[in-house]
Amino acid sequence: MFPKQEYFVGNIMDYYIQKGMVDEGLAQINKLLATSETPYYLYVKGILLYEKKQYDDAVAIFNKIISNNGDLVAEAYSKIGDCYFFPAQIIVEENAKLAIDDPKYNENENKIKELYEKAKPYYEKAKELKPDNKALWGNYLLNIYWKLNRAEYDSLEKELGY
């Protein structure tokens, strides 16, 4: 029997992720969701989908948490931001290997900005809901503001005490 306590579910799902057994984790969390659709179980499912890089499906799950307006709303906003931010980081790393005059460089820069623009309101909402939980939004917004709006970057840098 699979445990139902959130603590155990979270630890088991972390194990599945570390071992590359995300599909097994999804199968288990779907069974739990069939009996009890809690914000925590939904959040875990969203994380598993995120780990599989099924970002649209993950966003749909996180939006369900937000629309239910219960627990983990700020965290769900942050994870939606992650669904745009981290794919952008892959492109940032790719661009670091390209010459600035490479046509692909500008194309990538535009993609990065587009993904950052999508991520930004979700991190800002997480900040609004949980201003003291900087792990949800702090460094992500700093990176985004650095790329998109230096004035916001300077202001946030001061706020974070850097």
Provide a role label for each language-model segment:
Residues 22, 55, 116, 150-151:
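TPR-repeat structural position
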Residues 16, 49, 84, 91, ...:
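Residue at a conserved register position within TPR or TPR-like alpha-solenoid repeats
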Residues 1-11, 35-44, 72-76, 133-137:
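Generic helix N-cap/helix-start motif at coil->alpha-helix transitions
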Residues 11-16, 45, 80, 87, ...:
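Structural register within alpha-helical repeat arrays
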Residues 86-122:
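Short coil/linker segments at helix-helix boundaries
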